[in-house]
Amino acid sequence: FTLVDLNLPYFALPNTTDFASLVPGIGPNRTTRLHWFEYNVHAIPPHQQLQNFSAPLAEYQGPMPPQGDEAHNYVLYLFEQPEGWKPEVGAMQRYNNASDSFARMNFSVEALSTQVGRPIAANYFLTENENNTKTA
């Protein structure tokens, strides 16, 4: 499972002026942010209850669109992980620190797909900062 924000504005990344280097998000000068990454999850019979057999690669962090920004698209992707697949050590170290939000920015679902295959299911929701000032 991965949960990814597809609308992260460029100003959320420190010192970013090279927009061509960003993983494309939805809209100009937008990128992505990883909010959750679980792997080694299996459906356990008889009721196919999901059970995780490892710690999350990136612990869950809830949606947090910046105040004053448009609604953000959050997508939950489900991948069928290949037998014996484990994340790269560098990724494990990079995402392990839940308080380091910059390490989770510019996340590439496409790069993950090259390792484990295309998503087999997905769902999404929209949310925005409830403190936004509405106009018109």
Name every feature range the model reports, one short phrase each.
Residues 2-136:
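N-terminus-centered regions that define maturation/targeting leaders and the start
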